[in-house]
C-alpha cells in the first residue's frame, strides 16, 4: 500500500543515533527501560485486578493509565530497538500509518486519563463528603470513554492528514518511529494545512488536559495549605510534587515537540524530546503511582502472601 498519489511503499527509520559505538549500549539501555515498563505496568494492572479494596475511582483510572503505558511503549520501543541492531530499519507504509495511529491514540488518551486522575484527587481532597456522588461509576465510565474517544478522534485526524500527503523519492524518516512532524518533512507537496491541523489538534489534546491538571493540583495545594497539619502538608506536598513532575515531563515534552512550527525545532532535538513522553514517562508512572502508595504496597504484600502460602 502507498500513500495517495505517492510512489513510496515503505519508509526507513533513521533511529536515534548515527554513531556505531553507541548502538549496542543504547540497545541495552532502552531494552532495560522497556522491561521495567512492561513489568511495572503489567504488575500494577494485576495487583489492581486481584485486590478488591483497590476497586475505587482512583485505581480504576490508574489501571487504565498502566494499560495505556504498556500498549504505548509496546507500539514504539520494539521497532526502536531494531534500529540499534539492524543496518536498515525498514517499515512498510501500512505499518508506519498503523504505528502512527496507535501512537496518537495512546498519547492523547493518556493526556485525558491524567486529567481525570487529577480531577479525582481534587474531589477526594477538596470535597470529600461529595466524593462518592461526584465520582460515581457512571461518571468514571463517562470520563474514561471521553478519554478514549478523544484519543480515537485525534488519531484519526493526524493519520488521515498524513495519508493524504504525497511522498516522492525520499523515504528516510529522521526519527526512531513514525511520528507526525518527520513525515510532514518528507512530503513533496505543501504541508502548511497539515501543520495547521497538527497545531490545532495538539493544542486541544494537550491544552485541555494541562488546564484541568494544573487547576486541580493548584486547588489541592491551596486546600492543603489552609487545612492540613505540618506533617500532613509535608506528605501531601511530597506526593503532589512527584505527580506534577511526571505530568510536566509528559505534557512539557509533547508541547515542546508539537506546538512550534516545523522550521523552528530541529528534528534532532525533537527526537530527544520524544524520549520523555514515549520512554521515560511510561517507566516512571508505575513507580510514582505505586511505590509511593501505601495501598498498593499493602496489596502487593497480601498478593505475595497468598501466593507463598497457597
Curated annotation (Swiss-Prot):
<dbReference type="GO" id="GO:0005886">
    <property type="term" value="C:plasma membrane"/>
</dbReference>
<protein>
    <recommendedName>
        <fullName>Olfactory receptor 8B12</fullName>
    </recommendedName>
</protein>
<feature type="glycosylation site" description="N-linked (GlcNAc...) asparagine">
    <location>
        <position position="5"/>
    </location>
</feature>
<dbReference type="GO" id="GO:0005549">
    <property type="term" value="F:odorant binding"/>
</dbReference>
<feature type="transmembrane region" description="Helical; Name=5">
    <location>
        <begin position="197"/>
        <end position="216"/>
    </location>
</feature>
<feature type="transmembrane region" description="Helical; Name=2">
    <location>
        <begin position="54"/>
        <end position="74"/>
    </location>
</feature>
<feature type="topological domain" description="Extracellular">
    <location>
        <begin position="75"/>
        <end position="98"/>
    </location>
</feature>
<feature type="topological domain" description="Cytoplasmic">
    <location>
        <begin position="120"/>
        <end position="138"/>
    </location>
</feature>
<keyword id="KW-1003">Cell membrane</keyword>
<dbReference type="Pfam" id="PF13853">
    <property type="entry name" value="7tm_4"/>
</dbReference>
<keyword id="KW-0716">Sensory transduction</keyword>
<keyword id="KW-0297">G-protein coupled receptor</keyword>
<keyword id="KW-0472">Membrane</keyword>
<keyword id="KW-0807">Transducer</keyword>
<feature type="transmembrane region" description="Helical; Name=6">
    <location>
        <begin position="237"/>
        <end position="257"/>
    </location>
</feature>
<feature type="topological domain" description="Extracellular">
    <location>
        <begin position="258"/>
        <end position="270"/>
    </location>
</feature>
<comment type="function">
    <text>Odorant receptor.</text>
</comment>
<feature type="topological domain" description="Cytoplasmic">
    <location>
        <begin position="46"/>
        <end position="53"/>
    </location>
</feature>
<feature type="transmembrane region" description="Helical; Name=1">
    <location>
        <begin position="25"/>
        <end position="45"/>
    </location>
</feature>
<keyword id="KW-0812">Transmembrane</keyword>
<feature type="topological domain" description="Extracellular">
    <location>
        <begin position="160"/>
        <end position="196"/>
    </location>
</feature>
<keyword id="KW-0325">Glycoprotein</keyword>
<keyword id="KW-1015">Disulfide bond</keyword>
<feature type="topological domain" description="Extracellular">
    <location>
        <begin position="1"/>
        <end position="24"/>
    </location>
</feature>
<feature type="transmembrane region" description="Helical; Name=7">
    <location>
        <begin position="271"/>
        <end position="291"/>
    </location>
</feature>
<feature type="glycosylation site" description="N-linked (GlcNAc...) asparagine">
    <location>
        <position position="189"/>
    </location>
</feature>
<dbReference type="InterPro" id="IPR017452">
    <property type="entry name" value="GPCR_Rhodpsn_7TM"/>
</dbReference>
<dbReference type="InterPro" id="IPR000725">
    <property type="entry name" value="Olfact_rcpt"/>
</dbReference>
<feature type="glycosylation site" description="N-linked (GlcNAc...) asparagine">
    <location>
        <position position="164"/>
    </location>
</feature>
<comment type="similarity">
    <text>Belongs to the G-protein coupled receptor 1 family.</text>
</comment>
<dbReference type="GO" id="GO:0007608">
    <property type="term" value="P:sensory perception of smell"/>
</dbReference>
<feature type="disulfide bond">
    <location>
        <begin position="96"/>
        <end position="188"/>
    </location>
</feature>
<feature type="transmembrane region" description="Helical; Name=3">
    <location>
        <begin position="99"/>
        <end position="119"/>
    </location>
</feature>
<feature type="transmembrane region" description="Helical; Name=4">
    <location>
        <begin position="139"/>
        <end position="159"/>
    </location>
</feature>
<dbReference type="InterPro" id="IPR000276">
    <property type="entry name" value="GPCR_Rhodpsn"/>
</dbReference>
<keyword id="KW-0552">Olfaction</keyword>
<keyword id="KW-1133">Transmembrane helix</keyword>
<dbReference type="GO" id="GO:0007186">
    <property type="term" value="P:G protein-coupled receptor signaling pathway"/>
</dbReference>
<feature type="topological domain" description="Cytoplasmic">
    <location>
        <begin position="292"/>
        <end position="310"/>
    </location>
</feature>
<dbReference type="GO" id="GO:0004984">
    <property type="term" value="F:olfactory receptor activity"/>
</dbReference>
<dbReference type="GO" id="GO:0004930">
    <property type="term" value="F:G protein-coupled receptor activity"/>
</dbReference>
<keyword id="KW-0675">Receptor</keyword>
